[in-house]
Swiss-Prot record:
It holds the Pfam family Mur_ligase_C. The gene is murE. This is UDP-N-acetylmuramoyl-L-alanyl-D-glutamate--2,6-diaminopimelate ligase. Transmembrane segments: none annotated. It comes from the Bacteria. Keywords: ATP-binding, Cell cycle, Cell division, Cell shape, Cell wall biogenesis/degradation, Cytoplasm, Ligase, Magnesium, Nucleotide-binding, Peptidoglycan synthesis.
Length: 500
């Protein structure tokens, strides 16, 4: 039997009827689902009107097919009298996930869901966890920046963390197709906007906290609080646990906050003071990475992986700790870590035909990520390291000069180009980046056309040299103005090397 509006009002007392058309009765109004995208609504849906859309509320409400409108009680908007209006005291987006979960029969309740948050490393860590669990027979799902993956399906959602309605629908699909374990990225946007509300989580994993998204968050404290929110919403009925990198930026502070506010939540901390899990003796090459991980009982294990870069020492160690919490076999994990499938756009190497030169494509688009990838590439001792990067338009502008300083200090030469300029003028973005260079420093090339910049960068690369192409990684598009064009760093590098 289809859900009725009266069932919803009973389940969520915070919802109040703002208006009910004459002749309508909550007992007879069918409710199919809830959506915050007016384009996805059907007549029996609820259109959730987020506060974040501001002055466009009226426009979206007039375009929706939904018969029920949910909005903040302070909204002063004229609504067609044929619509049913529901009101609430909080931002409706914060309720959306719980309502979506209720309407779908709480699909996440029977799933083992691990959410990973942090400025950098979310995509790599969730992909590593997916591989480890799958190798041990678990039927897994993956949700994140690269898309959604389960069974033979691969879906591009366009978001690191999909909106709450889409997320619950994805989880229901996964559950219906036999998935038992899900690894998902939890972005700070998703956490602050309530996209994970109503999701029953088994574990939360924290990688690090460095500057990003200050165009969205008021300051770093607000950014941190959004990350902490993940651990507050873990499902206590699932014996939840937390995993964090104590030595990473923000790790110490998060550990302390969890201890003070969530004293019953078990924590597995990497490199914590007095902790049982510590990393030592990392050895990095272009063939792979190895390190020693200390374990409880004065034991240790050398871990080897095909993944490259110092950051993957942290990622694989955190994945191992998370796997322990999920009951995965340690020996099986040690074996699986040796051959993790290439994560698209993460330290992805492309060699020239004769392998005398190489390019590294990486998603690094924050100061910390750029520094980490340049240092990791440096470990391969290229004869010359040229770093090519830009910064996204309509995003945090304060990181632009910082990334310039990092590129100048750690690279032999620098090429400036466009990332996703969006509504900003590409040359203006490059001006702001270039303001971070020291007096007298001039980039090797300044070219807003990213394809041309990559081609010229490869063209001047000497034998034994490396071109680091940073910022877009796996992305297969470039946003210029309002237009989303096909574009792939990997494709452009391969073209420049004459590989196709």
């Amino acid at each position: 039997m289809k859900m009725k509006l009266t069932n919803l009002l009973h389940e969520f007392p915070e919802l109040k009827l703002g208006s009910l058309p004459s002749g309508k009765n909550p007992d007879s109004v069918p409710i199919e689902y809830i959506q915050s995208d007016s384009r996805k609504t059907n007549p029996e849906d609820i259109f959730c009107v987020p506060e974040s859309i501001g002055t466009k509320k009226g426009e979206f409400i007039s375009n929706t097919k939904a018969s029920v409108i949910l909005l903040h009680r302070s909204s002063n908007i004229s609504i067609d009298s044929s619509k049913i209006v529901l009101e609430c005291e909080e931002d409706p987006e914060q309720l959306q996930g719980r309502i979506a979960s209720f309407l779908l029969g709480h699909p996440s309740k029977t799933l083992e869901i691990v959410a990973v948050t942090g400025t950098n490393g979310k995509t790599s860590l969730t992909n590593i966890l997916f591989a480890l669990a799958k190798d041990q027979g678990k039927i897994c799902g993956l949700i994140g920046t690269i898309g959604v993956k389960f069974g033979d399906r691969s879906i591009d959602t366009g978001y690191t963390t999909p909106d709450a309605s889409s997320l619950n629908l994805i989880l229901k699909q996964m559950k219906d197709e036999g998935v038992t374990t899900v690894f998902m990225e939890a972005s700070s946007h998703g956490l602050k906007l309530g996209r994970i509300g109503g999701i029953s989580l088994k574990a939360g994993v924290f990688t690090n906290l460095t500057q990003d998204h200050l165009d969205f968050h008021s300051d770093m404290e607000d950014y941190f609080e959004s990350k902490f929110r993940l651990f507050e919403i873990l499902d206590v009925s699932k014996s939840p646990f937390a995993v964090l990198d104590y030595s990473s930026p923000g790790g110490n502070e998060l550990h302390r906050k969890i201890r003070n506010n969530l004293p019953d939540l078990p924590i597995k901390a990497l490199d914590g003071i007095g902790g049982e899990y510590k990393v030592s003796n990392p050895f990095l090459t272009l063939q792979g990475t190895s390190y020693v991980l200390s374990l409880p009982g004065n034991r240790s294990q050398t871990i080897s992986t095909n993944l490259l870069g110092s950051f993957n020492v942290r990622n694989t160690a955190l994945a191992f700790l998370t796997g322990l919490g999920l009951g995965l076999d340690p020996k099986g994990m040690f074996s699986s870590l040796k051959e993790i499938p290439q994560i698209p756009g993460r330290f992805q190497i492309v060699y020239s035909k004769d392998r005398s030169r190489m390019a590294v494509v990486d998603y690094a688009h924050t100061p910390d990520a750029l520094e980490n990838i340049i240092r990791s590439v440096r470990n391969s001792r290229p004869k010359r390291l040229i770093t090519l990067f830009g910064c996204g338009g309509d995003r945090d502008k304060t990181k632009r000069p910082k990334m310039a300083r990092i590129a100048e200090e750690l690279s032999d030469q620098v090429i400036l180009t466009s990332d996703n300029p969006r509504s900003e003028k590409p040359e203006a973005i490059l001006d702001e980046i270039q303001s971070g260079f020291s007096p007298g420093f001039t980039p090797l090339l300044r070219e807003v056309d990213r394809a041309r910049a990559i081609s010229e960068g490869v063209g001047i690369l000497p034998e034994g040299g490396c071109l680091l192409v940073a910022g877009k990684g796996h992305e297969e598009y470039q946003i210029i103005g309002k237009e989303k064009r096909h574009f792939s760093d990997v494709e452009e590098v391969r073209k420049a090397f004459g590989l196709f």
